[in-house]
Amino acid sequence: LKAYYFQSSRGLPKATTLYNDFSAQHLWDKNAFIQSQYKKEFSRQWVFRTSAKWNWSYQHYLDPAIKNNEGKTENSYYQQEYYLSASVLYRLLNNLSFSLSTDGSINTMNANMADFAHPTRYSWLTAIAGKYVNEWFTLSVSALATVINEQADKGGSAGNHRKLTPYVSATFKPFRNEEFRVRFFYKDIFRLP
């Protein structure tokens, strides 16, 4: 079990305009998380691993010199994440293994602004992979299934996404006594903002 807490308070620089470099902007950050991991080797062939994490972050921004109706800009943001992960590894032979992993997370974000969307994102990622290794050659293949469901209390959300992305990698060691390798790979990536 691991726990972490971080807190900071700092001024932010502003653009220098006509030799005026004064800035009253300020940013406060707080971040805390708790995580745990568990690993169990049932045999030389079977290995199970799981982890869990809770993360909380807070950010407060203040610019007292802004020219608006309130005479300042002041925003607070809160974010939480709940994350679970599990994987199983199966070694069929000494140089051939397969794995199945899955990650799930829930992310929420809130702010003190009147028209803030208050988004919530549910993410589920599952990968199946295989790996072959010998002294001259390594081959890795995998497929990642990504399922994202997003909702917002106000306005539009980024929507729901489903994607299957492949990965293939081949590594060759052409010389026995030299640590020189040639690697080829193909990867299709999918990311959300």
State what each model feature region is.
Residues 2-49, 54-80:
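Flexible loop and strand-edge segments within Gram-negative outer membrane beta-barrel domains
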Residues 3-4, 93-193:
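Structural signature of Gram-negative outer-membrane beta-barrels, strongest in the C-terminal barrel
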Residues 17, 21-23, 31, 35-37, ...:
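Generic structural signal for short, flexible, solvent-exposed coil/loop and linker residues
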Residues 25-27, 39-41, 75-77, 89, ...:
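Residues embedded in well-ordered secondary-structure elements
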Residues 31-37, 51-53, 81-89, 123-129, ...:
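Membrane-embedded beta-strand positions in outer-membrane beta-barrel channels/transporters
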Residues 76-102:
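Outer membrane beta-barrel translocator domains of Type V secretion systems
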